[in-house]
Regions:
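Short nucleic-acid-contacting surface segments enriched for D/E, G, S/T with interspersed K/R
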Residues: 217-233
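Generic detection of short hydrophobic beta-strand segments and adjacent strand-loop junctions
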Residues: 111, 214-216
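Flexible, active-site-proximal loop/turn residues at the rims of small-molecule/cofactor binding pockets
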Residues: 236
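OB/S1-fold single-stranded nucleic-acid-binding modules
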Residues: 2-183, 239-265
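OB-fold (S1/OB) nucleic-acid-binding surfaces
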Residues: 186-214
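Broad gene-expression machinery/nucleic-acid interaction feature
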Residues: 129, 181, 201-203, 211, ...
Length: 265
């Protein structure tokens, strides 16, 4: 499945975790540290189990689906906002039709959705207010838009979702993932420290085909400067900005205008 299952590996190869300062060798180590932190909150009830979220003051998040198919996947408390029609592919992966305020489609992308397990059995959710964070896997920086255009031959407003292409092709030969390729301009950049681990990471606000947050491992490098271009590959995460109040059943899922379909959870 698209969610990152708890893995038992002996080496630090979880680049996506390191990009938000969760510098653990194993997913299980991250889960155990999150549980011990006393910063867990129940997002909602799912098929007799729970969807639990750990949120670090740095914005780093860990979502834990404590019922079959049991998944652990990262997220981030992003500052950028947008709108999308949201349709779940499985318990974790969502197909997003990212739209502008007039309803015009900007892009289609697949992302690991923080509330995904709550919506897995629900129909298409239209006009959802969402936040998007790209977790950098392999990126490079260009001094300016002109430098990017000179090197790549195109304007730096790229966002291509491999998972969305797989879904639109209708081919069952490939499994969609939240992987994406992007190029965008840096609007803001700052260093943050994950309190759970003490590890630093870079948090950027990006202006590209649509606005999104970008998190990168610190790596001892200088922060990308404002108006520089960052491009490369990433894992896309998303969160629905749900209205307060919820459904009154502890599900933690808002049912306001266009709500997120809390029935049956």
């Amino acid at each position: 499945m698209a969610g990152m299952n708890v893995k038992d590996t002996g080496v630090k190869q979880n680049t996506e975790m390191q990009a938000i300062g969760l510098n653990f060798e194993r997913w299980q180590d991250a889960v155990e540290a999150a549980i011990a932190s006393d910063r867990l909150a129940v997002t909602g009830e799912v098929r007799g189990g729970q969807l639990i979220q750990f949120t670090d003051p740095s914005g780093a998040q860990l979502n834990i689906l404590a019922v079959e198919p049991f998944a652990t996947f990262i997220g981030f408390n992003a500052v950028t906002q947008g709108f999308a029609h949201v349709e779940m592919v499985n318990d974790v992966l969502a197909l997003l039709e990212i739209i502008d305020p007039f309803g015009t489609t900007i892009a289609q992308a697949t992302a690991n959705l923080a509330q995904g397990p709550l919506l897995a059995d629900e129909p298409l959710q239209q006009w959802q207010q969402i936040s998007l964070t790209a977790v950098g896997l392999d990126v490079r920086t260009y001094e300016s838009a002109a430098a990017y255009e000179a090197a790549e031959g195109e304007f730096p407003a790229l966002f291509e979702s491999a998972g969305a292409k797989v879904i639109s092709s209708g081919s069952g030969a490939e499994v969609p993932t939240p992987a994406a390729t992007f190029a965008a301009r840096v609007m803001e950049s700052e260093s943050r420290t994950n309190e759970l681990t003490g590890e630093k990471f870079a948090h950027l606000v990006m202006d590209g085909l649509f606005p999104f947050d970008l998190c990168l491992p610190a790596g001892g490098n200088e922060l990308p400067a404002k108006d520089s271009i960052v491009a490369g590959t990433a894992l896309l995460t998303a969160s629905i900005e749900m209205p307060s109040g919820g459904c009154g059943d502890g599900a933690g899922c808002g049912c306001g205008s266009g709500g997120c379909g809390c029935g049956g959870h």
